Amino acid sequence: MIEHPYPQGTDDWLEARRGVITASRAKDARDRDSKGKPSAKMLNYAMDTARERCGGKAAPVYQNAAMRMGSEEEQFAAIEYMARTGRALSEAFFITTDDRKFGLSLDRWVDREAAIEVKTMVSSATLFKAMVEGDISEYRDQCVFALWMLRLQWVDLCLWAPDLPNPLKVIRITRDEAEIQRLEDDMVAFDRLVCQYEASLRKAMGTEPTAAPPWEAPTPAASPAPTVAPGAIPAPAF
């Protein structure tokens, strides 16, 4: 794993993320229509990622006031989490796999074996869906991605509503190996789709293709065992 110790939002941070399939977009990478076909959201994300891997820049993601509030409130949710649980948290940076295919930004480490993910309940619709109804489907893929990539023991999803008397609800997401395997399969399949778009774009530009990822590299054929003529086998010593 490679840790990129850059403040969030800086040019170095953005460069480290370029062309990387990230945990925050894992849900988009798995998105399909009612017929099970890749959705426009999935295909657009694949094309954006392929464009970045070819040296380009996808359109910047618009950050509205609600998104800015979510980023600003993260530190206060972390303080409340520590006060409630007694656990120490440590700063986390953007981390990628060695091949820089996949990456994620944890909100905080918990003893380097677990993590927290903070989601601020800015809109009332989000508040009631997640906190009241318990529907965390918008965030689950992101948390499972962290369990998969970093082999964490658990992720505490922190639903944060700072305007309420009891502002923090913690939902622990633990390892489910079958669920993690399904996500891994989908991420590898999505990367193959990105590679297809990348190859077609490089062909159109007349540039060299990139090296194949480790899981697509051909397996070398096993060397046959040497044969020995019967007369060449030495007689036993007894």
What spans do the regions from the language model cover?
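Charged phosphate-binding loop/patch that engages nucleotide di/tri-phosphates or the phosphate backbone
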Residues: 191-215
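Acidic-basic catalytic patches of nuclease active cores, encompassing PD-(D/E)XK
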Residues: 66-89
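Charged, glycine-rich intrinsically disordered N-terminal tails and low-complexity linkers that flank
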Residues: 1-72, 208-238
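Generic structural marker for isolated residues within well-ordered, non-membrane alpha-helices
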Residues: 47, 78, 143
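Nucleic-acid nuclease catalytic cores
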Residues: 85-198
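Context-gated lysine
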Residues: 27, 35-37, 41, 57, ...
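Amphipathic alpha-helical interaction segments
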Residues: 21-22, 147, 156, 198, ...
